[in-house]
């Protein structure tokens, strides 16, 4: 029986009714650039292995479009044959869960077989794993497209990230790490209902609840199996930023900002591109306080005309296809870095008012 798996496809339009064509810090060298490689007489930048590809069909296509032009190939892995993005790649491998013994050894085996030059993690837990094992792969000539391990850990811990923002004078929604600290902060007028309650190390919108009274807040905090944080409810507009931090210069080389119109399952389903120099500068400053590298997804709120940084996911965001179709092509920036070249800064180099609307599509095949 042929399985059917859904993935997200993207439609762009110039308006909701009409479709269209498509400060200072030291530079951080995440890896040492090396000369371009030659295989079979052709010069190429890399073969890339994308880990835990899941439903990121579009992303796999974007990398194929980029690296086929450079005589490269895109190989992917997942632990399930029901991951539709497997069937978009030049080659795919079913692997054990990343938490099982021997996972890294299996990835190394695939890298040797496919002559892989770079690894790209997409899943939260895999960011930690690859960041911590970067040197292991670099010693084999394989580069992990991932941020510094400490910065990955900080961004994944939402309370630590809030404290980092606070210590660096970056506006953020006030956050507490316990019911007791919430009660103290509320008495001091720093926070009040409604609030968001969310897992400290959650992803997407999983486990997030709006809470309007202390009774419910106490129940959630007392009986949750996960460590929770309590954050001031942001009653305003929500924005997402797709950022590329150059892996050679350590600076933000590209920023694309979209206003989120509608969310589904923690990902942006409908959005419109926007530009704001004040927001670009806030993003630059925030990035400069961390050792980030490669594709970054940032969430921002605007309340009463003021911007507040909500969180950073140091990976490709689910809404990245909007940026790609607006001409912000991170795979090309990755390829440039992997060939040993730093990218020039091009902030806001896209059309404003370009809308994205996702819809469901399917892959049907024998597995």
Predicted regions and their residues:
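ATP-binding N-terminal substructure of ATP-dependent carboxylate-amine bond-forming enzymes
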Residues: 23, 41-145
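ATP-dependent carboxylate activation and anion-phosphoryl transfer catalytic cores
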Residues: 114, 275-367
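Active-site nucleotide/adenylate-binding loops and adjacent lid/helix of ATP-dependent enzymes
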Residues: 152-235, 247-249, 277
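Short hydrophobic targeting helices and cationic amphipathic motifs
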Residues: 7-8, 32
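Phosphate-binding site of ATP-dependent enzymes
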Residues: 209-291, 301-302, 306-308
């Amino acid at each position: 029986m042929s399985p059917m798996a859904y993935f997200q496809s993207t439609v762009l339009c110039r308006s909701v009714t009409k479709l269209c064509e498509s400060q200072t810090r030291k530079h951080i060298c995440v890896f040492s650039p090396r000369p371009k490689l030659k295989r079979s007489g052709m010069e190429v930048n890399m073969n890339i292995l994308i880990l835990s590809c899941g439903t990121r069909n579009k992303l796999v296509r974007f990398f194929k479009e980029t690296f086929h032009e450079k005589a490269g190939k895109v190989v992917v892995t997942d632990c399930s044959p029901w991951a539709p993005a497997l069937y978009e790649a030049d080659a795919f491998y079913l692997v054990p869960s990343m938490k099982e013994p021997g996972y890294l050894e299996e990835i190394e085996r695939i890298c040797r077989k496919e002559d892989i030059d770079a690894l790209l993690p997409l899943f939260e837990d895999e960011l930690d794993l690859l960041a911590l094992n970067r040197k292991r792969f670099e010693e084999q000539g394989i580069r992990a497209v991932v941020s510094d391990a400490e910065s990955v850990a900080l961004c994944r811990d939402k309370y630590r990230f809030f404290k980092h923002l606070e210590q660096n004078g970056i506006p953020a929604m006030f956050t507490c790490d316990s019911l007791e600290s919430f009660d103290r902060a509320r008495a001091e007028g720093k926070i009040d209902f409604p609030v968001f309650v969310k897992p400290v190390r959650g992803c997407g919108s999983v486990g997030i609840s709006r809470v309007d009274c202390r009774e419910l807040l106490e129940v959630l905090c007392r009986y949750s199996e996960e460590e929770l944080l309590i954050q001031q409810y942001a009653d305003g507009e929500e924005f997402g930023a797709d950022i590329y931090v150059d892996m050679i210069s350590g600076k933000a080389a590209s920023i694309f900002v979209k206003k989120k119109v509608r969310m589904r399952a923690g990902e942006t389903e409908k959005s419109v591109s926007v530009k704001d120099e004040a927001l670009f500068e806030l993003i630059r400053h925030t990035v400069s306080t961390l050792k980030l590298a490669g594709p970054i997804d940032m969430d921002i709120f605007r309340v009463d005309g003021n911007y507040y940084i909500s969180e950073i996911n140091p990976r490709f965001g689910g809404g990245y296809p909007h940026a790609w179709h607006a001409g912000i092509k991170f795979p090309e920036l990755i390829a440039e870095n992997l060939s040993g070249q730093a990218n020039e800064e091009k902030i806001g180099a896209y059309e404003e008012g370009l809308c994205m609307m996702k819809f469901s599509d399917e892959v049907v095949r024998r597995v």
